[in-house]
Structure formats: structure tokens, C-alpha cells
């Protein structure tokens, strides 16, 4: 990549922190955390391979205060300390550079940026080329003909066009612009309410921060002039803080930075000491050395399947698990009933049949008739020194719901696979490892799968008998009883035997795809929190729901009488076939169109709404009938039946792996779809109440998806609006309808809101026209004006569609891959493109709120509060708090939700309290 005499300057701690958050929390053979060390080593090896530098240096901060702290004591004061498992690795990162023979540069009182600036400018002055390896925006100030910036996150050189696109100015003016904007991550104040667009405009006009303050009377905006006047000192201090010192007193000798290959024995010892086996091959190829001690990572051979039927056998298994330090475990269920524990250890599977198949969450005690094994298994699950590998963790958490200790050191293959491939069918994920079947794990065990398939059934039995002939103790298929039907579980046992191998494979794959932090920091911890939420549930007023059901029922009967009167006959309104015949044959109404796949007429909402627009009253009655019957059947009739007899609360189930974006879903019952936009929907929400002595608290992210769009698509106009705390829907309405604020009506703002959120979902002119009840031409003009006002949105959409088409997926702010498998389907391409546009936004929203949930759970536990999280509804969290904790928890919720991630725009949370869910909306 580089020319012969190019100097490569590597931002050391920038790489280390990136490595920490990109890699899994690995441990060395001694049990020390080494994930950041591993990632740092891997990155340096890649740089050597890609750049083949003659001169190179890794530059480190010295730590402690530097000259910027004396200018501004609050500099970087808002930064939290690094995670503990990273702190212990920091003293060792220099060993990584040393073992790879990288020269190291650092000096007390100076940041790495200043040392990089010094060596870069001095080397460039000699006519040599410099490449700075960093994702730090501050270093963009150094860009010149001889100094290039290579962003390792994006794998590309940063160009002046990139700088202009992001900051609205060229690199030589970046210091001036950033002094006005400030830097939230470094606690550099800047000037309030000035974003990139305004800052670049001011610098274009005046040339520098100093010139602005020397010519304040020439600033046209009175508001800006006043803001600048009040922030003069902050802006000038920011200018000093952002600038780089290119005259650090260090011995500058380019020849001292010449790289030569490392000592092979020293490097081998280092890689072996920390257990970096997966780097052996790369090091061997790069440095032409030989490293012994290669070990096969995956061994799919299953030698035995045994049944454990007594305590002594299980105790022996536990002893072996303690020695080895890792085992597989799976709770086999069918239709919610617990059938067997399947354990695995060193290619052997062990089956423990469960005699009590009750799956009621609160009446079921894990012991009951299973005293001989339940405590032993739980002690293994709670042992921090033994790693457990499972698939679908929540059933295990529920089985041991009444235990006082927590399950620890457990990994979930299902969540690992989801972090790697959200949006892809889960049924294929075990295919390569198993070489036998590509159906979901939970379905592999059942004999009903072989029903009518003699060849497959025979093959399954033959496989078991072949095992027996080679020494296996499984003479016949192992079975457990489900009702009166035996279920074969040999196939499940074979899969569980592969858990450890699959885990090791997934670790490497997660690392290679930079997805481990998604799994370890978000998906795995949120599983425990969702389990807690499911156990807590939410209280529902059954008597009120019964009363509401009666009310709905009475109106439904009245509607039916009116429908029958208008149609002239009685019929089954719920039968689409009968309804179509009545409307379009008997009554001869227009718009009758037979469904393409059926002989019946189409009677969907679109047809009924069209009839309503043309004055046919029966259509209004039918729409109302459908609305009420759905509410009655889905909520007022069914919710009381789903109230638990012991807790007197409703307990939904949250699904983590059912969406393409990382979004959670809810089922049995679905409490994320409780209607809100109708008076009847609000009546149903009134049934969700706080326990006596408690209040419900709703914490709702405000316009979160538009804020995310402004950040990931870098939309200056949107950013500025959010920074200024402007009403974004009002701003959009003014632009779209060419009106001043005082001229706007509620209808204008409603339409602007529909446009703002419709664009996020890739809405077409046709779809928008229908939603706003305007012509296609008007809707098309609205979209055109929107793209003109918010420059960059259309470009983001086109780039996202192109990326999805080329790669089959898109990524969110956190790097989660959201796969779009239908992107090349001719019939569904437009749908897939809309999904691709929205997935990074919706996925980022989903991960932001999950991070907030994790942080809130930790804070509630830390403070020993009784407040509990009961529901998550996409961008809303619903809490139940004791009345005396409400004033304590509200500021905690607000702070954590608003600061769980760092974006270019503020994240705002709206909080309301009440006795029921309706009151807080």
C-alpha cells in the first residue's frame, strides 16, 4: 500500500480500545483477560501485512494530565473510567508492540495526537510521506499532500471530500469549525446551539474563530450574535484544546523508526503465553517462522450417548465438568413441557429424563420429583469457574426460577448465531456442523418428524445401531414420554454433543465479523433482563376488562343488526366469502374484484374504505364491526384468561431472535401491539394498572428514529434542528407547505409528521398519497421538497439500497448486520429495499434501548431499589415503582436512557407517571 520511505504512525490506545470493543472477552491459559491484547495483536499483524512499512511507530498516551487540563480543568472530565477487564490489560499493550518489533513513542504530559502531529509534520518537512492509522477526527487537521489519514474502521484513506461532507469544511479549517461545534466526548464546550452546518458557514464567511469575534457586528443573525457573544471564552478555550502541538520535545530520528522482523522465539513465546493460537498461522506466513502446538478447534465425532438415571452418575459427571471447565446443556421441551436435560462433555452426551412436565412458570418448582438431579445441575449452572454452553437460555432460567442464586458463565449459541445473522432463517444454522439435518434444533428430536418417511426413520435407527456396534452404550433409541407418545431424543443428544465445538467456531466467527460485543454486551445480558421482566409481569384489571368486553359486545350486536338491515339478510359477517357475495352480488356495490387466488371477492380494509368514501354506510359499519371484534377477541376476552392464578398478573414472552433488526417482539400475549390511536385502544390500556402502593412510569424516546437518521446519514439540517430543540415536524411543515410557523395548522403538522416518519420507511409517492389523502403528484412533490430540505437523506437511501444489493445485508450504528435475503427477489425487491433503508435506523433504536435497559437494571440493582421494568414497547420502557421511589427513579431513568450512547444530536426521553397505562399516554 505505501511507498518505500513512508512512515506509518499508529494511534496505539485508539487501536487498543477499538480492539477491546470489537473482540470477545478472551482469557489466557492463566485466566487473565486478554481480549484487547488479542485484538491489538491481530490488528498490528494486519497492518504489517497490508502496508509492509519501512518506518513505523506505535504512539501511546502517557496517561495522567496534560497541558490541556491546565487550560481547561474539565477537559475529558465526563469520560467514565475504562472497564476493569481492560484496565488490567493496558500495561501489557506495549509488550504487544515490542514483541512485534514496533518502535514505541510516548512522552509524559502529552497525548498521542500531539506526538503524532510532531513526527508527521517533521517527516513531511523532509519530503517523506506519512500515513497516520487512526479513526480520531482530531488528527484530520494534519492532512496535507504528504500526510494521509487511513481509517482502519472503514479500511480506507480519508479524503478532503470526506472531511467536507462530514464537517462542511476542509481539513485546514477543521480546528476552527470544531472549536465552534465542541466535542461532547472530550467535554470541549464549543458554542451552544451551533452545529456543523452553522459552524462551517461562519468559518467560510470569517475565516477563523478569532475573526468571528473581531467582527461580531457582521453576524447577520441576532440570535447567533448573542450566542457567540455569550460564549466567546468557551469558543477560544475550545480552539486551544482542539489544536495539536506539533513541537513536542522528542528526539526525532527517522532511522530510529525502521522496522525489522521480530525475534521468532520471543514472538512464539508471547503468542503461546497468552493462548493466541488462532494467530499462529498468520504469524508463520508473515514472518516465515514455525510455531508448534497447533490444536484442532473442532471435533464433531460423537462417541457415546448415555442416560444418567441416578445421583451418583450425575455427581461423577459434575466432577468431570469441574476438571474440564466447560460442558454443554440443553433443556429439551415440547409445547412448553420439560422433557429432558441433555448434557455433553468431550463428545459424550448424557440424558436425564424429567418426570414432572408441568411448565407453569410459578407453580412449577424445579425440584418436585426431580430432587436427585435438580440441585446438582443448578450448582453447575451457578459455578462461575465452569463455562456452560446452551441453545436458548431462557428455558433454563425459567426452570430454575425459584433459585436464590444466578446462573453464571453461560453462553447461548442461539444468541451467538443471531448476532451474526439477524434476518437469516435460523433453521440452517446448525446444518454445516451437524451434517445430518437442517431443521431447527428444537424440532430434531421428535419421531413425528419421521412420520410417513420410512427411509428417514430407518436411517435414524440404523445410525444408532451402528453406534452400538462401535462401542456406544446406546443400544436403542432413547425415548421420553410426551403424553402417551414416545419421543426419540438421540438426534437432540447428537446436536448437544457438538455444542462446545460450535461455541468455539462461533467465537471465531463473531470475532471475524466484529460482532462479539453485540452478543456479549447486549444480546446475552438482555436475555437475563427479559427473563426477569417475564417473571414480574404486569397487573391487569380483569373486572374492568370484562365490563369493557360487555360494552364492546353490545355495540357489536347493534352493528350486526344495522348491517343486516342494510343488506336485507342475515349472514356470517366474519365469512369473507359470504360478505363478498352480499356486497357485490346481492347489493351490487361497485369495486367488486375477485381475489386472484380464490373464488371469493376482496373485502379488505382498502375496498371497504373506498366504498365508505363513496357514501356506502354499510362499509363504515363493517369497518367498525371489524375493529371492535378484533379488540374484543384479542384483548377484552383473552387477557383475563391469561392472568396467572398465583401472581394475578399477565406474563408475556419476549422474543429476541425473531426480527431482522434486533428489535424485540412479544407474544402470548403480544403486549407491544396494544392499540393507542383510538379511544377504544386507550380504554384497553386503562386495564393495565399499577400494583397497590405503586405507580406506572412510562419513559419514551422522543423522535428517536429521526435523531438516529440525522446521525447515521449525517443530515446537517436535521442535526441542527435537534441541537436547537426545534419542533422537527413544524420545521418540515414550513418547508413542505411554504408557510411561516404562525400560518401552520394542526393538519399541516400532522401531514409533516407522516412525511418525516414515512420517509424513514422508504414510503412511495403512492403510499404517501394514500396516507395523506392527496394526489400522487402532490405526494411526489412533498417527497421532492423533503429531499431538498434535508440534503443527504436521498443519498443515504440510495447508498443503503446499493450496499444491501451488493452484500445482502446492512449494518446499524453498533455494527449489527441486518440481513435482507429478499433483496434480489424480483417480486419483493421494493419491499426489501424499504426494509434495508429502515433496518439500520430501527436496529440502532433497538440496540440503544436494550443498552439502556441493561444499564438501568444494573443501577436499580446497585441502589437496591424495588422499581421494576415490566414492559418494553420498542422505544418505550414501562416501569412499576413504589410511590416513595418515583421521585428517585425518574432522574435515573432519564439520565441513563439519554446517555446510553453517544450521537451527534441529543437523545431526549419523555417521562410520565400514572396509575394505569392510559393515564401516561
From Swiss-Prot:
<dbReference type="InterPro" id="IPR008918">
    <property type="entry name" value="HhH2"/>
</dbReference>
<dbReference type="InterPro" id="IPR029060">
    <property type="entry name" value="PIN-like_dom_sf"/>
</dbReference>
<dbReference type="Pfam" id="PF00476">
    <property type="entry name" value="DNA_pol_A"/>
</dbReference>
<feature type="domain" description="5'-3' exonuclease">
    <location>
        <begin position="1"/>
        <end position="283"/>
    </location>
</feature>
<dbReference type="InterPro" id="IPR036279">
    <property type="entry name" value="5-3_exonuclease_C_sf"/>
</dbReference>
<keyword id="KW-0227">DNA damage</keyword>
<keyword id="KW-0808">Transferase</keyword>
<dbReference type="Pfam" id="PF01367">
    <property type="entry name" value="5_3_exonuc"/>
</dbReference>
<dbReference type="GO" id="GO:0003887">
    <property type="term" value="F:DNA-directed DNA polymerase activity"/>
</dbReference>
<dbReference type="InterPro" id="IPR020045">
    <property type="entry name" value="DNA_polI_H3TH"/>
</dbReference>
<dbReference type="Pfam" id="PF02739">
    <property type="entry name" value="5_3_exonuc_N"/>
</dbReference>
<dbReference type="InterPro" id="IPR002421">
    <property type="entry name" value="5-3_exonuclease"/>
</dbReference>
<dbReference type="GO" id="GO:0003677">
    <property type="term" value="F:DNA binding"/>
</dbReference>
<comment type="similarity">
    <text>Belongs to the DNA polymerase type-A family.</text>
</comment>
<dbReference type="InterPro" id="IPR012337">
    <property type="entry name" value="RNaseH-like_sf"/>
</dbReference>
<keyword id="KW-0269">Exonuclease</keyword>
<dbReference type="GO" id="GO:0006261">
    <property type="term" value="P:DNA-templated DNA replication"/>
</dbReference>
<keyword id="KW-0548">Nucleotidyltransferase</keyword>
<comment type="function">
    <text>In addition to polymerase activity, this DNA polymerase exhibits 5'-3' exonuclease activity.</text>
</comment>
<dbReference type="InterPro" id="IPR002298">
    <property type="entry name" value="DNA_polymerase_A"/>
</dbReference>
<dbReference type="GO" id="GO:0006302">
    <property type="term" value="P:double-strand break repair"/>
</dbReference>
<comment type="subunit">
    <text>Single-chain monomer with multiple functions.</text>
</comment>
<dbReference type="InterPro" id="IPR020046">
    <property type="entry name" value="5-3_exonucl_a-hlix_arch_N"/>
</dbReference>
<keyword id="KW-0235">DNA replication</keyword>
<dbReference type="GO" id="GO:0008409">
    <property type="term" value="F:5'-3' exonuclease activity"/>
</dbReference>
<dbReference type="InterPro" id="IPR036397">
    <property type="entry name" value="RNaseH_sf"/>
</dbReference>
<dbReference type="InterPro" id="IPR005728">
    <property type="entry name" value="RPE1"/>
</dbReference>
<keyword id="KW-0238">DNA-binding</keyword>
<dbReference type="InterPro" id="IPR019760">
    <property type="entry name" value="DNA-dir_DNA_pol_A_CS"/>
</dbReference>
<keyword id="KW-0234">DNA repair</keyword>
<dbReference type="InterPro" id="IPR001098">
    <property type="entry name" value="DNA-dir_DNA_pol_A_palm_dom"/>
</dbReference>
<dbReference type="InterPro" id="IPR043502">
    <property type="entry name" value="DNA/RNA_pol_sf"/>
</dbReference>
<keyword id="KW-0378">Hydrolase</keyword>
<protein>
    <recommendedName>
        <fullName>DNA polymerase I</fullName>
        <ecNumber>2.7.7.7</ecNumber>
    </recommendedName>
</protein>
<feature type="domain" description="RPE1 insert">
    <location>
        <begin position="439"/>
        <end position="486"/>
    </location>
</feature>
<dbReference type="InterPro" id="IPR018320">
    <property type="entry name" value="DNA_polymerase_1"/>
</dbReference>
<keyword id="KW-0540">Nuclease</keyword>
<keyword id="KW-0239">DNA-directed DNA polymerase</keyword>
Amino acid at each position: 500500500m505505501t511507498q518505500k520511505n513512508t512512515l506509518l504512525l499508529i494511534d496505539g490506545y485508539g487501536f487498543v480500545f477499538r480492539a477491546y470493543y470489537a473482540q470477545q472477552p478472551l482469557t489466557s491459559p492463566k485466566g487473565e483477560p486478554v481480549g484487547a491484547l488479542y485484538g491489538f495483536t491481530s490488528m498490528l499483524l494486519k497492518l504489517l501485512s497490508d502496508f509492509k512499512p519501512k518506518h513505523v511507530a506505535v504512539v501511546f498516551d502517557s496517561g495522567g494530565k496534560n497541558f490541556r487540563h491546565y487550560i481547561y480543568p474539565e477537559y475529558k472530565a465526563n469520560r467514565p473510567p475504562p472497564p476493569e477487564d481492560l484496565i488490567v490489560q493496558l500495561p501489557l499493550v506495549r509488550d504487544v508492540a515490542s514483541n512485534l518489533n514496533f518502535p514505541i513513542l510516548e512522552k509524559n504530559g502529552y497525548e498521542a495526537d500531539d506526538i503524532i502531529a510532531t513526527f508527521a509534520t517533521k517527516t513531511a518537512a523532509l519530503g517523506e510521506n506519512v500515513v497516520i492509522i487512526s479513526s480520531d477526527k482530531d488528527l484530520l487537521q494534519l492532512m496535507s499532500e504528504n500526510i494521509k489519514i487511513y481509517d482502519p474502521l472503514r479500511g480506507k484513506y480519508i479524503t478532503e471530500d470526506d472531511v467536507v461532507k462530514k464537517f462542511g469544511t476542509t481539513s485546514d479549517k477543521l480546528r476552527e469549525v470544531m472549536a465552534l461545534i465542541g466535542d461532547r466526548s472530550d467535554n470541549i464546550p464549543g458554542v451552544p446551539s451551533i452545529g456543523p452546518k452553522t459552524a462551517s458557514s461562519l468559518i467560510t464567511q470569517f475565516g477563523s474563530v478569532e475573526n468571528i469575534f473581531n467582527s461580531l457586528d457582521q453576524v447577520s443573525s441576532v440570535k447567533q450574535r448573542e450566542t457567540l457573544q455569550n460564549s466567546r471564552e468557551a469558543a477560544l478555550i475550545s480552539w486551544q484544546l482542539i489544536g495539536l502541538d506539533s513541537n513536542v520535545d522528542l528526539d526525532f530520528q527517522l532511522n530510529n523508526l525502521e522496522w525489522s522482523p521480530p525475534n521468532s522465539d520471543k514472538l512464539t513465546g508471547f503468542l503461546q503465553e497468552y493462548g493466541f493460537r488462532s494467530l499462529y498461522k498468520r504469524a508463520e506466513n508473515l514472518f516465515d517462522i514455525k510455531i508448534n502446538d497447533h490444536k484442532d478447534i473442532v471435533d464433531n465425532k460423537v462417541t457415546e450417548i448415555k442416560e444418567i438415571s441416578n445421583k451418583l452418575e450425575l455427581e461423577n459427571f459434575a466432577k468431570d465438568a469441574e476438571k474440564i471447565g466447560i460442558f454443554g446443556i440443553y433443556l429439551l421441551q415440547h409445547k412448553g413441557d420439560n422433557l429432558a436435560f441433555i448434557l455433553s462433555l468431550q463428545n459424550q452426551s448424557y440424558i436425564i429424563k424429567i418426570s414432572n412436565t408441568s411448565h407453569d412458570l410459578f407453580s412449577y418448582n424445579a425440584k418436585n420429583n426431580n430432587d436427585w438431579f435438580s440441585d446438582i445441575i443448578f450448582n453447575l449452572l451457578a459455578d462461575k469457574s465452569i463455562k456452560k454452553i446452551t441453545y436458548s437460555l431462557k428455558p433454563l432460567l425459567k426452570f430454575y426460577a425459584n433459585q436464590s442464586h444466578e446462573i453464571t458463565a453461560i453462553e447461548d449459541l442461539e444468541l451467538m448465531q443471531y448476532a451474526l445473522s439477524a434476518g437469516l432463517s435460523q433453521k440452517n444454522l446448525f446444518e454445516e456442523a451437524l451434517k445430518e439435518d437442517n431443521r431447527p434444533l428444537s424440532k430434531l428430536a421428535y419421531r413425528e418428524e419421521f412420520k410417513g418417511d420410512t427411509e428417514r426413520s430407518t436411517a435414524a435407527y440404523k445410525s444408532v445401531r451402528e453406534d452400538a456396534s462401535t462401542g456406544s452404550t446406546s443400544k436403542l433409541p432413547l425415548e421420553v414420554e410426551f403424553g402417551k407418545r414416545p419421543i426419540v431424543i438421540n438426534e437432540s443428544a447428537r446436536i448437544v454433543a457438538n455444542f462446545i465445538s460450535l461455541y468455539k467456531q462461533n467465537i471465531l466467527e463473531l470475532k471475524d465479523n466484529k460482532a462479539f460485543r453485540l452478543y456479549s454486551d447486549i444480546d446475552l445480558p438482555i436475555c437475563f433482563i427479559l427473563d426477569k421482566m417475564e417473571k414480574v409481569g404486569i397487573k391487569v384489571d380483569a373486572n374492568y376488562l370484562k365490563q369493557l368486553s360487555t360494552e364492546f359486545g353490545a355495540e357489536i350486536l347493534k352493528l350486526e343488526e344495522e348491517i343486516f338491515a342494510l343488506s336485507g339478510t342475515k349472514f356470517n359477517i366474519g365469512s369473507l366469502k359470504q360478505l363478498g357475495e352480499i356486497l357485490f352480488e346481492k347489493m351490487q356495490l361497485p369495486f367488486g374484484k375477485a381475489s386472484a387466488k380464490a373464488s371469493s371477492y376482496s373485502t379488505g380494509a382498502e375496498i371497504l374504505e373506498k366504498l365508505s368514501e363513496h357514501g356506502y354506510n354499510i362499509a363504515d359499519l363493517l369497518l367498525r364491526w371489524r375493529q371492535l371484534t378484533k379488540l374484543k377477541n384479542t384483548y377484552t376476552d383473552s387477557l383475563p384468561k391469561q392472568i396467572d392464578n398465583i401472581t394475578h398478573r399477565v406474563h408475556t414472552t419476549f422474543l429476541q431472535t425473531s426480527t431482522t433488526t434486533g428489535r424485540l417482539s412479544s407474544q402470548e400475549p403480544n403486549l407491544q401491539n396494544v392499540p393507542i390511536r383510538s379511544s377504544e385502544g386507550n380504554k384497553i390500556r386503562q386495564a393495565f394498572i399499577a400494583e397497590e402502593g405503586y405507580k406506572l412510569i412510562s419513559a419514551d424516546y422522543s423522535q428517536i428514529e429521526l435523531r438516529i437518521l440525522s446521525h447515521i446519514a449525517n443530515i446537517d439540517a436535521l442535526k441542527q434542528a435537534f441541537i436547537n430543540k426545534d419542533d422537527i415536524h413544524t420545521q418540515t411543515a414550513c418547508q413542505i407547505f411554504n408557510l411561516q410557523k404562525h400560518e401552520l395548522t394542526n393538519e399541516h403538522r400532522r401531514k409533516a409528521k407522516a412525511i418525516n416518519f414515512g420517509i424513514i420507511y422508504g414510503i412511495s409517492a403512492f403510499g404517501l398519497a394514500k396516507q395523506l389523502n392527496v394526489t400522487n403528484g402532490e405526494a411526489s412533490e412533498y417527497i421532492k421538497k423533503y429531499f431538498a430540505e434535508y440534503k443527504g437523506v436521498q443519498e443515504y437511501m440510495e447508498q443503503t439500497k446499493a450496499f444491501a444489493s451488493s452484500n445482502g445485508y446492512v449494518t446499524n450504528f453498533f455494527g449489527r448486520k441486518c440481513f435482507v435475503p429478499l433483496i434480489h427477489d424480483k417480486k419483493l425487491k421494493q419491499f426489501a429495499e424499504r426494509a434495508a433503508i429502515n433496518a439500520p435506523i430501527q436496529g440502532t433504536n433497538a440496540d440503544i434501548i436494550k443498552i439502556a435497559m441493561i444499564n438501568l437494571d444494573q443501577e436499580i440493582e446497585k441502589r437496591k431499589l424495588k422499581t421494576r421494568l415490566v414492559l418494553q414497547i420498542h422505544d418505550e420502557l414501562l416501569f412499576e415503582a413504589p410511590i416513595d421511589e418515583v421521585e428517585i427513579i425518574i432522574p435515573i431513568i432519564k439520565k441513563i436512557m439519554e446517555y446510553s450512547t453517544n450521537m451527534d444530536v441529543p437523545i431526549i426521553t419523555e417521562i410520565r407517571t400514572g396509575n394505569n397505562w392510559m393515564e401516561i399516554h
